[in-house]
Design a protein with these regions (language model features):
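Extracytoplasmic cell-surface/polysaccharide-interacting catalytic and binding patches
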Residues: 2-269
């Protein structure tokens, strides 16, 4: 009888020791699997991290070192509806050699010629669809578009004609608001198009220009994705601003308004 009792006591002690060992070992271990992932996977408990509810979204990186330029130089002049050119403004221009009558800034002409030569060397045909336009020429273009929209109304004082003028503003720049008057802008195509639909144009042609234009001091002035900032969607329009500024603008995916505002804080766009 005493032997049975002793054996029973030893069993209890042994069982207690085993249970104690298990509990202690569990206390020292981290949970193996506790969280299910959205893709059906699971992760270890010690690898789980939770978002800080007070954290703020990391802003898009902005350029640190901006070009040291004099924004008052003619090549940086801002031209839009709020920053107009006078009717008397006439830059020094000359004919672009590969065209019949298109004119461009004399000072920037070597850069344009070099870019168009390189474009042709890359295997593309170049068609200059627009370059320098005087104030009076832009005025004729605008009035022609307004009259076309208003037809058959011809009375300038008629409300319907005024509505046509407002519609024309969405299609054609008003005189004094076009960069073409600066003599620093060109509309470039690989051929003459009957309608300007960018998606139907040669995208390899523009891919080359977008990659290399800054090497010659030009920027893509009115890219589609910057429409809300520039007010215009003309991805075939290239503007000369000089190599330093052009490389910075194109490399940082800026439109000219964003670049200009850095140097002229009061400028709003």
């Amino acid at each position: 009888m005493r032997r049975k009792r002793t054996a029973w006591i030893l069993c209890v002690v042994a069982l207690t020791t085993v249970l104690y060992t298990i509990v202690v070992s569990r206390m020292d271990r981290k949970t193996d699997i506790i969280v299910g992932g959205v893709d059906g996977a699971f992760v270890r408990g010690d690898s789980v991290s939770f978002a800080d509810p007070n954290a703020t979204e990391t802003p898009e990186p902005t350029p640190d070192i901006w070009p040291d330029i004099d924004i008052t130089l003619p090549q940086y002049q801002m031209v839009n509806e709020e920053h107009n050119l006078a009717a008397a403004f006439e830059p020094e221009v000359a004919k672009i050699e590969r065209t019949s009558y298109m004119m461009f800034s004399v000072a920037a002409m070597p850069h344009l010629d070099a870019m168009l030569d390189a474009l042709e060397d890359a295997g593309f045909t170049v068609h200059v669809g627009g370059a320098y336009r005087s104030y009076s020429f832009q005025n004729k273009m605008f009035n022609s578009k307004a009259s076309q929209i208003a037809y058959p109304v011809t009375d300038y004082t008629d409300p319907k004609y005024q509505e046509a003028v407002e519609e024309a503003k969405k299609i054609t720049m008003m005189p004094g608001t076009s960069e073409h008057q600066l003599g620093l802008a060109v509309d470039l195509f690989d051929k003459q198009y009957t309608r300007l639909v960018y998606s139907e144009m040669n995208q390899d042609f523009y891919a080359w220009l977008d990659e290399h234009c800054a090497e010659y001091g030009f920027i893509k002035r009115y890219p589609t994705k910057k429409l809300l900032l520039t007010g215009w969607d003309e991805p075939w329009h290239y503007r000369y601003v000089g190599v330093e500024a052009a490389k910075f603008i194109m490399e940082n995916d800026l439109c000219y308004e964003e670049f200009y505002a850095h140097y002229v804080p009061e400028f709003k766009y």
